[in-house]
């Protein structure tokens, strides 16, 4: 069976293949002759980034895992200034990180096509909010393309580069969790010769200070030019191949469906058995093409806009209709929820209310049954993997700092430390926020060591911030510099599992690896020492006792302490071992030694360990044990031992 990375590079125009939405976008970028791709991984965009990393060398594309989205944006933007086709990708909250450069550079335009792929996450399946990128785009006056299928995602990617070059303007390709992760038929197009031969493309930057030096005197002229340009793009989108009107021409009711909502609307109409309706399928939620609106509204008596999250299309349509003097009812967020993702059910309920119909399914009855079943089925909360080094780090931190300590944390697998029995996460906000929050708490409760009023000699509030290795490089560095500079009193534990694990095992500056070979590794402890941290140490969390003792020592220091807890991600390590046919030790419980104290369950919480109610002893599920030996270290009665060959 062919790998996805092979399929994405197939030179088979016309071949129909099954691809994920993100994989289809990667193929589209290659068909568009992309030269530079830079991104920071973030679900639900990561598959695009990883696919580009896998094919970059073979396709002659420069690809990098940037340290954060702002840097990725700037890297790709500079390539586009140099006349190359460039792309950056990020999840929706990543655009917050890139926003400073994004909003400040829109007016400068581009030379080569520049596409910003942003993957939104309605319902927050893997995110801390469900912000709508289309609102950002409207604010910045950047056009948005939004696909309704994987094939359309591929074709839209190519069109986005063409649109960007035609107007020398940024273009956002907006997906959602469902469109990024949906699979569907994709018809392959022609690959450019440079991609097929793997010929690397190089650009040329032409100096123009009045354009690229964003001082007020230069920037002042940009705003009117941006507004003029977006209206020209609006006019262009009247002929966009991803916008069309379908259904009965003489219908009295109409539905506007942008992006993936179009697929839900089509399915909902089939459920309801409704055919006497006109549909405006929008692939460009911003700016909405007004010429197409005029054709669509002709003869209609009422309209429903079905869109996820914010009323971006609705506001544009209502403004246009008001200016045109149209006084027909236009419904949107009064019938379609403003929160969480679109579903077929939501589309059915909204359209049924709009048309005064009964839903074909009794959803209330289904909800009632679901509630009853939910009470019977035992909950299965997420947990850290067996052998996860973060569990050992948290166990040692909790033991050393105690339950009264405050534990700001960050975005990563380790956020699961909030759950029992570890309970060593008290706050999470955004990437890198653990150190800033930890510093703020320390200043608020302990004061700064630079202050005369510092609570010297008094019992200090212990604050232990935890942050991952990739997150440390992403946005942890400025916060660490700030804490050291302002003489904070906080312990920062960097949970270094030598990979960007949660988003798919991508490399980062701490690993030194890049898609093009070995870069330069930047050890976290060297950075902390260079910044002037008052205490720096490196521990192996698989040695719980040594980790505990080091953390106790760090807590005694007045100032900023940094402990790097370094051990490779267990899931990544086991995957590598499986591919190489290697084995790992499996632990079991010696029943005669087990007293049933439950420390291994109630304090440590490895998912491979469970309670046997018959023997009243702990047991290890051998299919889940990955042999880290943490259980043997936390058990006070030495009841855990590695199984011998043949047991």
From Swiss-Prot:
NCBIfam families assigned to the protein according to its UniProt record, in alphabetical order: IOR_alpha (TIGR03336)
Keyword Transport: yes
Disulfide bonds: none
Known catalytic reactions: indole-3-pyruvate + 2 oxidized [2Fe-2S]-[ferredoxin] + CoA = (indol-3-yl)acetyl-CoA + 2 reduced [2Fe-2S]-[ferredoxin] + CO2 + H(+)
Gene: iorA
Name listed for the protein in its UniProt record: Indolepyruvate oxidoreductase subunit IorA
Listed GO MF terms: 4 iron, 4 sulfur cluster binding; indolepyruvate ferredoxin oxidoreductase activity; metal ion binding; thiamine pyrophosphate binding
Enzyme class, first EC level, given as a word: oxidoreductase
Residues noted as binding [4Fe-4S] cluster 2 in the record, renumbered to the chain: 606, 625, 628, 631
CC cofactor note: Binds 2 [4Fe-4S] clusters. In this family the first cluster has a non-standard and varying [4Fe-4S] binding motif CX(2)CX(2)CX(4-5)CP.
UniProt organism field: Thermococcus kodakarensis (strain ATCC BAA-918 / JCM 12380 / KOD1)
Binding site for [4Fe-4S] cluster 1: 594, 597, 600, 635
Subunit: Heterodimer of the IorA and IorB subunits.
Presence of the UniProt keyword Metal-binding in the record: yes
Temperature dependence: Optimum temperature is 70 degrees Celsius.
Taxonomic lineage from the root: Archaea, Methanobacteriati, Methanobacteriota, Thermococci, Thermococcales
Transmembrane segments: none
